[in-house]
Amino acid sequence: MDTSGFLDLDINSGTTTPNIRNSVTTSNDIMSSIFDTIPTKEKKVDAAVESIFGTEAANSPLISSSIPPIPIEASTSTQQQQQQQQQQEEIIPSQPISVTKENTVTTTTTTTATTAVPTTTTTPTSTLINSEPIVVNPLEVNINTKVDDSDSDQDEQIKKENVVHEIFTPIVSIINNNNNNNNNEIDNNNNGNSNENTTTTTTNKDMNNSFSMGVTTASKDEHIISTTTVGTIEQEIHEKQEEPLISPLQSEFNKIFFSTIPLEKKPLEILKMNAFTGALKYSPLRGIAWKLFLGGLDINRVDKWERDITQQRKRYEKLKEEHCFDPRNSNSTYDPLSQNDDSPWNKFFKNLDTQKIIKIDLERTHPDNDFFSNPVIREMMATILFVYSKTNGIISYRQGMHELLAPIIYLYNQEYSSYKKLDENSSSTLVDFIYNIKYLEHDTFAIFERLMKFTSDWYAPAPTQQTNNSNNSNNTNNNNTTTSPSSSSSSSSSSTTTAAATTVSSSTSTSSSSSTITSSSSSTVSPPPPSSSSSPSPPPPPPLGSNSPTVASSSSSSVQDNEEEELSSKCNDVVLKCKYIHSILLKQKDFELYQHLDSLDIEPQIYLLRWIRLLFGREFHFDDVLNIWDALFAYGENLILIDYFCISMLTYIREHLLKSDSIYALKRIYKYPPVEDVYMLIKKALEIKDSNCSIAGMVKTAQPPTTLSSSGSRQIPNNNNNNNNNNNNNNNNNNNNNNSNNNINNNNNNSNNNITTPSTQANTLPFPETSTFESTTSSFQPYSSQLSSANTTPIDPLSNKTTPLISSTSNVSNTPNITSTSTLLSSSSSSSSSTTTPLQSHTPILTHNNNNSHFSPSPSSSSSSLNNSSHVSIPVKSNVKDIFANSKESDLFSLFSTATTPINNNTSSLSISNPTISIGQARTLNKHKSMTLPSSPLISQDSEALKQLKNTQIEFGNQLKEVLPFLEKGKNFLLGNEDELSKSEIDDFIKALEKVKQIQEILSNNNINNNNENKL
């Protein structure tokens, strides 16, 4: 060969197409440089190491052996290579990719050699990535790398291709360029089965022949370096139609009130169930639920809610403008010194006093909660309480009302502030209208006013002395009023406040020949009437001392007196509720605890007043109070669950109470222990309520006997003529229809001349039985209506013991009984002289007269013996302490010690059975307002034993009086050294000191009473 070309290979990282420049040389030079020398074993190892670790391996010539020259003819078509490149690019996953191509695919043809020779390894530089040692033919190839930038046209037509060889098989081949070999080579490259290749290509200008040398890599990993892309891959965006944004409150509201799917229960029942289980505290509809429970909104008129709420808000705005008037901001001029009631300045100054009291209470409202320290919230609460005080003129504002307002405004502010309309472009909905924070104050006032409809009577103030005097004067006028035979008159005891706390009412029906005295012992603790939660409680029974509808009113009565009487009756409601909880419910559910508290003389109103008026706001944590209110409001029926929740609270601490005395019991009740889960108390209260069904059912099914007699009535023997009884029987029975408040039933028995009057049912409220989820509410008769026959001894519903009653038969009665009344009700008629004892000298007396056959107050007392008289004098007081107020201590111990002599019925005398009674039993009778009174006189005042006992009591009292100062000093010393002594020792000393004081006071009072008796 004359000429041959040197292969110049451009191995640059930046380009993939080699630039080849041909140079003229001899064939001997080419053959000698490639095939002359065969390396030895040592040289092969050195060459391999040098090829791996050396940097000049690409430029150093390889030692090769001489082989016969082989004609080389290998070329590729540029057009086919471009088509193959396009097919390779189409294999890439179809994703929207923006690519900036900077490099092109380098493809080479595979040259195949027919000779197999020993191999050695070398590594080309700057062409392979992550490759292992290269297996090459041990031929020394001298490659001169020269680059000529001038041959650009020739460079574009020649491209490299990657050569795929089998691993560990060195092949050096020179083949002719044909289409079949090119297609196979490209397919192998596309399948990823090729490794990195080092390609050398040379062309012969004269013969237009080209050859290539391929070197395979011994690599197990597959690498594709055919293309290099620079750019960003854009992810496909799938546009989804988003649903309109709805707040959780809106979603919950629509789910309950506007559900397209029929619900298993009604919306109100769902809310009530959530309230009892505790799920309501997590609901955003708690405020609406309270308003529904209290009757602020009608659940059956959801479509009218927007109109009703608008009216409530407008009403509050009107009241606020009317009562929150400031004459300083008015354009008109008013006299600030005017005392006229219509004067704006006079109203303004009165309002300032009320507002000052309100603000003082608000400063003490939950001081540990920062929410109530906010000036905006305080101003809002002050305005609400002031507007309510002006709309409720009788009660106005009372301390404790702010405690009821605090949870309401806290809840409403929390819900109104958290609600936010997510989609401002959407139309306004009912939820958007309700939860408008602009009307937070308006809606808070609306629900607070609804709550006060059930609790306002509990805040009625105690009647003043002027009220008592006016009532007494009215009672006097009523007693002196002349009535027809069919009319009725009433009178009260001297103290309205004391009587109101013990009894509900008493009435009498009188005629010219008959008289009736009615009293109800069980009515002292009457339960409230069950009714729907949306209606206010019915009007209370007429107060003591007020005129009944059938009594002729006095000419001096006025509207102001009626308001005072109404206020007095409201004040009694909460006291009666306390007594009902203690004496009825607690006794039924836990008699042991009731008996223990009763023995400690702990009045129920001492602690129950705070529990009831504040709805347990100070006994539990603030969040627990909200949970308790959920259940109270959801149960409805005039918040009757309060009664049973009180019993649940007492039974929760019963073990502490049973082991403690009066001091520790009060401490435990006043400082109620923390409760981990208040729903346990709620569940217990519901169980107590449901367990009353059997008791109430027994009362409901009780049938009245033939002869009317009750534990709350008084049977008094009356020797009237048969003709008079027959004439007045119809008149007395007609009063039952006219007097609806008293329900006086007068049944005159002609055979035995008995006059019996059952307890009034109107004054005794029905016993609650049904639960909230029952469809109808049954009304049950009170305990006082449990009527028994004359032959059966009635059972006292409070003590479950036989109750003594005065009865009269044709024969001598061995068990005449009597129950006391709190007021003396009698007709205005004359009576003959009666006998009394010193015990009865200062008490109202009922005197029985054979001639006139009626009872009247005794004008004076007599010292004659009762056994020698035909009259019976019965002292009537509201409690046992008042009855024995003027008696001596010795009389108390010997009151029932002497047996009585039976009195013949012909002389209108009474025989008292079971005359012996202990002081403990007397205390129990005091609580129950029912006791047995003696018919025998007291021990003679001239007895020597009585004088000695008097002197002993006086001396003992004087000695205790001298000892008390030293005991007080010891108490102060112990309190000053609390660190050295144990708390139990100090408490024991204090208890002993208190008992000594009580004994000294009793002896001192007896000494004063003895002196008063001696003066009389």
Swiss-Prot record:
InterPro entries: Rab-GAP-TBC_dom (IPR000195), Rab-GAP_TBC_sf (IPR035969). Residues 526-544 have a biased composition (Pro residues). One of its GO terms (biological process) is negative regulation of asexual reproduction. The keyword Mitochondrion does not apply. Residues 1-23, 60-109, 179-209, 463-566, 704-872 are annotated as: Disordered. Residues 280-636 form the Rab-GAP TBC domain. One of its GO terms (cellular component) is Golgi apparatus. PROSITE patterns: TBC_RABGAP. Residues 79-88, 467-525, 545-558, 718-755, 766-789, 807-872 have a biased composition (Low complexity). Coiled coil: none annotated. It comes from the Eukaryota. GO terms for molecular function: GTPase activator activity. It holds the Pfam family RabGAP-TBC. Keywords: GTPase activation. This is TBC1 domain family member 5 homolog B. It comes from Dictyostelium discoideum (Social amoeba). The lineage of its organism: Eukaryota, Amoebozoa, Evosea, Eumycetozoa, Dictyostelia. The gene is tbc1d5B.
